[in-house]
Amino acid sequence: LKLNYLLNEKWNFETQLESYTPGALQNFSPDLKKTFVSILSVNYISNKINLTAGSIFDQFGNGLIFRAWEDRKLGINNSIFGLNAKFDYKKISVNTITGLQKIGTTLSSGKIYAIDIKYKFLEKFDMETSYVGRHENIDFTNENKPTNINPTTNLISYRINYTGSKFYLNTEIISKSEDFISEYGFISNSNSKKGSAHYLNTGYYSSGIGLDFTFRRLENMSIYSNRNLYANEFNDGILNFIPALTKQYDYSLANINVYQSQPNVSFLDPLLMKAGEIGFQFEFYIKLKKNSFFGGKTGADLNINISNFNNLSGDFSFEEKSYDLDFLNFGQTYFSEQSINLTKNFSNNFSSIFVFINRYYNKRLVEQSAGKVNSKIIVVDNIFNINDTQSIEFDMQHLFNTND
């Protein structure tokens, strides 16, 4: 149950009530139970100032350093309960956030401090910098308590964005201060690592053609409001957003053995040591003209996608839980995929989409389960338009799998 009350042009009140019957929903956090208030906020907006007290949803850049969001279908509400102030001055925009993060029906023990500053040089060019701090006291109960404990983890981001008439460029560099790693749900007293992220997205688009290239390197880039929630399956307490940079499909067989990003450090097995990911995605689109050799009588749309993501390369030590990483070298392959998508109108009433996917998925390394899966997927999707308001769609899908 959600209620929004707009008092006037400047004041807005919002609240949301959630209720769950006994027994956890599939893939929902078991902390979501009974009846509770999940959102409560008051917002004031004037010409240059935007103030919020209560539940805060926001994102810095593309979310690599900070994102507080809600997705009801997945049972996710990672809002910050606190204070948010935004204001503009000439070409500068400032956004500040402080508070505790919502975790199920409670709030985090870690305190969150964040600021984002955007400077717009030109209409098409701007620079941004962000800071996110998580302050959580660590209570080591054993006698090997470290002497150099810093309860605050700091993340700093620098971003450059350019959007032209035919060319665009977005780049981001993030540094993360040293932080203790959680293993098996317990915070390690001897395993603390720094982290970083490097991101580049660039592309070109014109009439009938488009190119897009994305590169990303992640090293120990997960950040949680509570350290003991590290790498939990429900995304409870996560402060940033790191999706897989691979092509998304509408077809059921194409959504088997899909890749999930690997930003975490893991020493669960001597053969499965990980410290992050490095990889890229390239996409090419072209509109094949009518009456051309490839376009035929009615023309066609061709899309080619290539993606490849690997473990970070370097020297790992399982006994010491340490590593010395190479910056740009690629380690073991997590996931690779090449796909071709052809959309063809045969007439005004009938069209087809032809999809071919060649995929490799290292299930053993990504999920710590058995198998290195090689797949080939073929899809033929047909649409027949009966009239302006009615159509019939039928598709054929086939999956060739090995080692799954």
For every predicted segment, state its role.
Residues 1-58, 64-67, 75-98, 108-125, ...:
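Beta-barrel outer-membrane channel/assembly domains of diderm bacteria
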Residues 24, 28-32, 68-70, 75-77, ...:
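General N-terminal targeting signals
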Residues 70-72, 78-83, 124-125, 189, ...:
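Short, surface-exposed, polar/charged, turn-prone segments marking secondary-structure boundaries
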